[in-house]
Structures are given as structure tokens and as C-alpha cells.
Amino acid sequence: MNFDDPVFWRAGAISTVLVMSVVLIMLTIDSLAAISQGGSNVPFYTVINQHIDYKFDAKRGNDMPVIGGPEPLFGKTVDAAGAEALIDKGKLVIQSRACIDCHTFFGNGAYFAPDLTKAWLDPAWETWQAITGAATREEAMVKFLMDPVTNRIWTRTMPNLGITQQEAEATVAYLKWLSAVDTNGFPPNFGHMQSKP
């Protein structure tokens, strides 16, 4: 073995690249199984038709979403294609309004306003229901998104982004689906909804 021979170093570099490429492919395939819709951490879009809760799992040592029985969003059950279209539109609304300039999603974004990763599960929506006169959490969220200035409860005010009823409903669908994603306990110390008897 001659360490001065460039062939030795070239062969070493090529074999290292090949081995690491195989490792990268294996890790990518493993990750896709966890992060794809319907994977181990990311539910199917139709989860918006179900009750979503957030409970501490002692075995894992963190909080995780718990998917329960039927609880259709806006009282209407949507099929897989309808749920995907609604969630895609909600994500587009969030991206087009640059919500990440003030909020965070999965820890990415600005920390000026609340993290929206588990926004659907936020116990504060019960207060917003009373303020907006809404009968349901989703109705309160829609009213808030359409007129955050009038419906504020804190000193900081979210600007009115001109969100329509349809856009607000799609955004709420996206936020409900997002709350069902298993984020391994992120965000930490997130509050819990009051369990219904």
C-alpha cells in the first residue's frame, strides 16, 4: 500500500462515495416512510374527519396526537380527494400570506406570533368561541382568520390579510391536519385541551 500513489486515494474516494450513497438512499427511503402522508408520523388527509387530541405518552416520554372517532370538519365528512384539495389550498393560503414571517411551523419561521404546529389543539380557541359567538372551534378559527383585528384577545394584533371564507376554511383544515402530525412532542410544553366527559 503506497500512500503516495494517487490511485490509492482515488480508489478510496470512489469507494467512500459509493458506500455513503447507499447509506443516503437507505436513510431517504426510511425517512419517506415516516414523513409521507399516511406514513408512521403523518396521517392521511382524511384525519380532518376525526377527533384529534394531544396526550402524554409515558412510554415515549412526550406528548403525541391521539386520533379518535368521527368529528367532521365544519360538520361535513370529506373524501380523500376533497380532503387533499382542501389541505393543499390551506397550505397555499398560509404560504401566499407569508404567515411564516410571524408564526412558526415545526419550529421554522419567526417567533413573533404563536407556533401554529398544534394550533388546532390550542385551548385558547374556547375563549375565541365565546368572543366570536361561534358554536364550534373551526367556526371560531374561521371568524378570527377573516377578521383578526376585531376578534383579538391579546395586545398584539394579527393584521387583516383579506382571507375569504373559503380560504379560511381551507386554512383551518390544514391546521387541523397539521395538529395530527406526530412531531415527537414538539412544540414542548404545549397545553392540553380539556377532555370532554
Q: Which positions does each model-derived feature cover?
A:
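Hydrophobic membrane-insertion alpha-helices, especially the h-region
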Residues: 13-30
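Post-kinase regulatory C-tail/linker adjacent to protein kinase catalytic domains
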Residues: 189-197
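Extracytoplasmic electron-transfer domains, predominantly the class I c-type cytochrome c fold
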Residues: 84-85, 96, 106-185, 197
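Perimembrane helix-loop junctions in membrane proteins
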Residues: 31-41
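N-terminal positive-inside, membrane-proximal cytosolic segments immediately preceding the first
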Residues: 1-14
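Short extracytoplasmic/periplasmic juxtamembrane "stem" segments immediately C-terminal to an N-terminal membrane anchor
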Residues: 41-61
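Electrostatic cytochrome c docking/interface patches
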Residues: 54-95, 134
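Short cysteine clusters
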Residues: 99-102
